């Protein structure tokens, strides 16, 4: 595989962030079709959209614990497989309650993605390259949201909304198979990493460890960081950003169809 395994892993993470948002936005884009087939109204869809975040929020924490215990490779692969399954099962939903349950399960399965990705970056990259890697993989999220409209819209119009979800399911499963074939928690556990790449990563990490020892950095508890104003302000800003983002991701496609007769 050459001497750039770590960047291949980043590419896979970039793709899974794209798939993550493609799967997440698919329901919003197909709402006008589903409303007619399942006789659902805006109030019910509001609860369905919101139910995703209850599962997602809880399993952000649980997913982080699982990543520390079982490793990022396993947790990420299983998470993608499960969320793809629950996304695909949307195709067989029969009404409000089945859609609600599937959306909660979908959110739970997506919860570990950020913890898994960050753990992989920490395992494969020294700090001097970590921000570049995170920036690249994070670009997958907005790009996934951008391509979701034309892709899901085309699939839904060409084959129907139920087959569209099955095709999206297949995309996630293909990614999962490739992930388990290529990824490992760290360079020293990868069967195909070159000695050149392994030595380079270890050398840079050793230099950083030596520098941290010289600086004698003090470790703090989680409570210490939760009391820092910069952390609280950043968290609030992120909350506001997500509120606006997911409002538009959830409802804007329906608005365009209902008010401007766009799309379906």
Question: What name fits each language-model region?
Answer:
Residues 27-28, 221-264:
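Extracytoplasmic gate region of multi-pass secondary transporters
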Residues 137-190:
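Helix-loop-helix hairpin linking two adjacent transmembrane segments in secondary transporters
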Residues 102-142:
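Cytoplasmic helix-loop-helix junction between adjacent transmembrane helices
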Residues 58-97:
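Conserved MFS/SLC helix-loop-helix module at the cytosolic interface between two early adjacent transmembrane helices
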Residues 34-35, 66-67, 151-159, 256-257:
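Interfacial helix-cap and linker-helix signal at transmembrane-aqueous boundaries
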Residues 8-42, 248-253:
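Extracytoplasmic
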Residues 39, 71, 92-98, 109, ...:
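Helix-breaking motifs and short loop linkers at transmembrane-helix boundaries and internal kinks
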Residues 25, 53-61, 111, 145-146:
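Residue-level signature of mid-helix packing/kink "hotspots" within the transmembrane helices
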